C-alpha cells in the first residue's frame, strides 16, 4: 500500500490535519454551548430584574 516514505508522510500529515480539524470542531461546539448557556443566564437575570422593577412601580 505504502511505496515510499514520502507517501507515508503525506498520509500522516493528512491524518494529523483531520485530527486538528475535528478538535477545532469539538472546541467550537463546546464554546457555542457555553455561549448559549451564558445568554440564557443573562436573559433570565434580565427578566427577573424587569419583573422586580415593574413590581416596585
Swiss-Prot record:
Presence of keyword Transcription regulation: no
Pfam families: IBV_3A (PF03617)
Cleaved signal peptide residues: 1-23
Domain of life of the source: Viruses
UniProt keyword list: Host-virus interaction, Inhibition of host innate immune response by virus, Interferon antiviral system evasion, Signal, Viral immunoevasion
A biological process from GO: symbiont-mediated suppression of host innate immune response
Role this protein plays: Involved in resistance to IFN.
Stated name of the protein: Non-structural protein 3a
Organism name: Avian infectious bronchitis virus (strain UK/68/84)
